[in-house]
């Protein structure tokens, strides 16, 4: 087991060095990533710059789709984060989690925009049964995610560690802090105490924040692309009704109605 771990560690550091070299080459050719002036301090280093470069090149098409999707739900989600005391930049954590798709699901059975596992979702008040899965409700799942993120921040005392804990779980991050003796995420990245996925997760989120702050400057012409329509009115239904009947009364297609209510 020790020999296998050493091989894995060696492979990680080789890959990390390769990534750092690519990021450095990109920085030399393209110039430094512009400073970010938002509410959450954004560190720009070789790890972040690697993902900036990736999203502008190999991952460009995917990131463009995320940006377009984000135009439709950002007005719904960001005010909820702000009102909950969570930095607006955490909107882009959801982008990395799911591509901002409420229908996203993982092999681990995480679901929705914020990729909640069933147990965590229920712990934070989301309803899951035969008829509804509120992990796919962009408003309710955002409120639950904001509550969870605030608890992680209050527990760990740092927003970067809260991001890492959202990915790895708070227990693993607390253990990494205890074993390493450091609460600096970037110093934890230099140890074996965090998984490679978590070490890359926070830089991905930060890269998304930087690119989305001024997408046109990075060649993403988001406003020229039509964003999907999102309903902004809530109507209470007082008795059971078939969705196709309700869609007919509203004068919309069943597909549109389901798109407005992805939790159903």
Protein language model features and the residues they cover:
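Short, functionally critical alpha-helical segments immediately adjacent to catalytic or ligand/cofactor-binding
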Residues: 86-103, 162-169, 257-261
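Catalytic cores of secreted or luminal carbohydrate-active enzymes
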Residues: 196-217
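An acidic, Gly/Ser/Thr/Pro-rich helix-cap/linker signature
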Residues: 1-85
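Solvent-exposed loop/turn segments at secondary-structure junctions
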Residues: 98-101, 120-123, 169-172, 212, ...
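Export/targeting segments at the very N-terminus of extracytoplasmic proteins
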Residues: 59-99, 143-152, 235
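Substrate-binding clefts and substrate-entry loops adjacent to catalytic sites
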Residues: 51-65, 100-110, 115-157, 179-192
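Catalytic and binding regions of secreted/periplasmic enzymes and modules that target cell-wall glycans
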Residues: 150-178
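Primarily a LysM-type cell-wall glycan-binding module
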Residues: 223-251
């Amino acid at each position: 087991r020790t020999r296998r771990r050493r091989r894995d560690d060696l492979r990680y550091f080789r890959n990390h060095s390769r990534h750092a070299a690519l990021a450095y080459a990109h920085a030399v050719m393209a110039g430094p990533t512009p400073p970010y002036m938002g509410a959450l301090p954004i560190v720009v280093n070789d790890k972040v710059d690697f993902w900036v470069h990736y999203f502008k090149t190999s991952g460009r098409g995917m990131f463009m789709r995320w940006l377009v999707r984000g135009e439709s739900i950002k007005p719904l989600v960001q005010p909820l984060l702000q009102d909950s005391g969570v930095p607006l930049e955490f909107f882009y954590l959801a982008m990395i989690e799911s591509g901002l798709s409420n229908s996203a699901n993982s092999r681990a059975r995480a679901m929705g925009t914020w990729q909640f596992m069933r147990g965590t979702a229920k712990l934070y008040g989301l309803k899951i049964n035969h008829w509804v899965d509120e992990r796919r409700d962009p408003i309710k799942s955002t409120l639950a995610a904001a509550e969870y993120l605030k608890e992680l921040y209050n527990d760990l005392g740092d927003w970067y560690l809260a991001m890492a804990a959202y990915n790895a779980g708070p227990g693993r991050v607390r253990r990494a802090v205890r074993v390493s003796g450091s609460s600096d995420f970037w110093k934890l990245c230099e140890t074996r105490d965090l998984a490679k996925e978590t070490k890359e997760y926070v830089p991905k989120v930060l890269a998304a924040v930087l690119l989305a702050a001024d997408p046109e400057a990075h060649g993403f012409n988001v406003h020229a692309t039509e964003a999907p329509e999102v309903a902004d009115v809530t109507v209470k239904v007082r008795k059971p009704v078939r969705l196709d009947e309700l869609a007919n009364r509203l004068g919309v297609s069943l597909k549109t109605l389901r798109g407005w209510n992805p939790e159903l």
